[in-house]
Amino acid sequence: MRKIILIFFIFLILQNIYAYEKIYDVNHVCYYTLTSVELQKFVKTAEIITPLNADNKTTITKDTILVGNPEENPLTKKYIGFFKIKINKTFPGKNKGIIEKQIINGHTVILLAGSDIQGTYASIITFANLNDIPENPIICETSNKVNIYSTSLNSEYFRDFIEKNILTPKEIEKVKSLSYKLKGKDKKATIENIAKWVANNIKYDYDKCKKIESGKFSWDEYNTPSETVKTKKGVCLDYATLTSALLLNDNIIPYMLDVALYNTSSLKISSYHASVAVKIDNTYFVIDQQPYLIPINEYTAQTFEDNLRIASIVMFRVVKERDGIKLIKEKEVPGIAIYGDLINLLEMRFNN
């Protein structure tokens, strides 16, 4: 009997340690709830530390809103031990974030962070709709993602299609002679030659793009690398697969990028884009339909057509294996601009 009671008390203690309020789905959050004077005052006076400005901050000296998980924000990493929920890249999970209040150095600190950028988005949007500072941690999530006919590289099925039908050893071999023509005096020169050739010789296929957007499109209509060379046109994925094939033939590892783009007015993901990155002297450079290389930190800050910006990038290393080509997930790179836009939304919300 004592053993049962002891187990029950341990269960209660563990439940209390990890207790949090119900999971909020930001798709069902209304703009905006009435907020308490305390919450409004806190947000207006608190210092907001995001991955954009965390490098110059070494300690908490006033009421603070910490934005971003420990891998993105060094100040979050320093103080994560103070929080009940130890957020990381895998917990609470994809598209999930947390809101948690703690007292650190005598100051109120609110952590708004996600396992990924979509989780951070969920935590900020949910926090903006609270009517008071939460006493217990909140886990929130969003289904703010777009699956345009599953043409995102994050789809295992779509990657499998590319590996078996587009970037096959046989198809890569067909553009080998072109790769040799573009080979430069060193790795960087070769990459620059490939970027220039693709940008100058391949035109964007707007008709195919319209078909994709309308849904009147099948995967089989994507080009193989040799088809892109022959027709001299393609959409972003066609550019990316051709570029990857040319790089592979010159023994350069390409990284195909799955780029999630968000609308700056709604801050919601609206589409996905494909491009390629290469690594030169431990720095990633992006090749994206332009005759030059773009450092990835500059690329993540770009604004695209229709006022779209990068929410996040998932990198897939393209490798040759015995049985063919594999796209292996390398890492996720958060967009730079989205942090600023989310904080602007938060400040606008509480300055009204």
From Swiss-Prot:
Transmembrane segments: none annotated. InterPro entries: Papain-like_cys_pep_sf (IPR038765), S_layer_C (IPR022651), Transglutaminase-like_domain (IPR007562). Belongs to the UPF0252 family. This is UPF0252 protein MJ1282. It comes from Methanocaldococcus jannaschii (strain ATCC 43067 / DSM 2661 / JAL-1 / JCM 10045 / NBRC 100440).
